Every structure is written in structure tokens, then in C-alpha cells.
């Protein structure tokens, strides 16, 4: 009886560990091609063609990579250069 309990506990543990990953994979697969049809000519499928990723924030004038404002002195001469920390690029002001 001890061996049966051990194998049952091992199986249950493995099942619990793998279940969330299997469910997530199944859910992801179902989202790829779902269509709702009212008639043969009218079907709404989603998701539609994937949109390319876009950057929400864009720098005004991108320059060379920088980590401090001093890195932008040569690039922005004679203007003052500021390092945009978000994009790590120089911005001339």
C-alpha cells in the first residue's frame, strides 16, 4: 500500500506542476484562429493579422548612445546636449 501511495503522490505532484503550463498552452492555441460565423459569407475571425509592435515613447532627435550629459557634448556642439536616460541617446537642445 505504501508504494501505491508514493506513486499516486508523485503522479499528483507532477500533474499539479504541469497543469498551469498545459492550460496556458491550450488557451494560447485556441486564441489563434477563432471564427464566429452567422452565415457562410459573414464570419468574424480574431485575432486579425498581428500588428507590428510600436514604441510608445520616441525621442525628439536621436543621437549616439550615452549614459551622462557629458557624453553628448561633442555630438551637439554648439548646442547643449542632454542624455535621454529612457532611450540612452543624446538630445540636442
UniProtKB/Swiss-Prot annotation:
Protein localization: Secreted
Primary location recorded for the protein, binned into one broad class: secreted
Cellular component GO terms, alphabetical: extracellular region
Keywords: Antimicrobial, Disulfide bond, Fungicide, Plant defense, Secreted, Signal
Cystine pairs: 43-83, 66-90, 72-92
Signal peptide per UniProt: 1-24
Top-level taxon: Eukaryota
GO terms classed as biological process: defense response to fungus; killing of cells of another organism
Similarity field: Belongs to the DEFL family.
Name of the protein in question: Putative defensin-like protein 283
Organism: Arabidopsis thaliana
Lineage of source species: Eukaryota, Viridiplantae, Streptophyta, Embryophyta, Tracheophyta
Amino acid at each position: 500500500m505504501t508504494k501505491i501511495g508514493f506513486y499516486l503522490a508523485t503522479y499528483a505532484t507532477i500533474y499539479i506542476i504541469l497543469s498551469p503550463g498545459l492550460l496556458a498552452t491550450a488557451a494560447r492555441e485556441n486564441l489563434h484562429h477563432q471564427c464566429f460565423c452567422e452565415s457562410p459569407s459573414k464570419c468574424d475571425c480574431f485575432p486579425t493579422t498581428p500588428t507590428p509592435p510600436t514604441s510608445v515613447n520616441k525621442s525628439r532627435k536621436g543621437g549616439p548612445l550615452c549614459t551622462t550629459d557629458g557624453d553628448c557634448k561633442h555630438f551637439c556642439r554648439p548646442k547643449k546636449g542632454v542624455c535621454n536616460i529612457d532611450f540612452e541617446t543624446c538630445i540636442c537642445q
